[in-house]
Amino acid sequence: MITGIPDISPYNVYSALNPLLVQVMALGYHFNMYRNKPLLRKGGVMIITHPCFDEFDPKFHPSYIEFFHRLLPESRDAFFLREKYEREFATNPAYIEMYRRGNAYHGAHPFFMWYWGENGRQHVGKVIGAGAENAHVPEMLGWERADNLTEAIAMARSYMGRNAEITMLHQPIIGLCNVSD
């Protein structure tokens, strides 16, 4: 499945679409917007097109910075992260202050963005970031990187086989697929 990730989401108005938001748009919104069964077969490849910048807005997403750079190198396991770190972020006085008196999302918000992508993470066999401008953001998310869509399709075919079918999920920012047998 190929899908483009727009540079906007419900969580980045007037700020950068940071790596965690790219992840939630891909494996959360785009993957999960279906009825009956996923558009992508179990173990299939999701190719996303996005530059995957390592950009965070410290005014709106301060806890996302720490989540990405401190927690993800340790583990991408949502259950582990929840048990070990969610309360720490939720009760962090600096994050609480920025949430209450500034413009920041709640300190625990990056966890919920990570959880929303969990169903997709458990279903896909591989995610390839086509056009990612660096290697470390896709790697941190557990993805592979391709220079362009042609290279990403070749990588997917080497994983799924030369006769693999390609579905282009061409949708507005948020859509819902109705898939039936």
For each feature predicted by the language model, list its residue ranges.
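Short, glycine/charged-enriched secondary-structure capping and boundary segments
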Residues: A16-L17, H61-S63, D181
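Active-site proximal loops enriched in glycine and acidic residues that flank catalytic Cys/His/Asp
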Residues: I2-I5, A16, G44, I48-C52, ...
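Flexible loop/turn segments at secondary-structure boundaries
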Residues: I8-N12, D54-K59, A135-P138, I174-C177
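C-terminal catalytic subdomain
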Residues: V22-K126
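Extended hydrophobic packing segments that form well-structured cores
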Residues: Y115-D181
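Structural signal for hydrophobic packing residues in well-ordered secondary-structure cores
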Residues: I2-I5, S9, L40, G44, ...
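Generic detector of short, locally flexible boundary/turn motifs and exposed helical patches
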Residues: P10-S15, F89-Y95, G129-A135
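Accessory "access/gating" subregions that flank catalytic or transport cores
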Residues: M1-V24
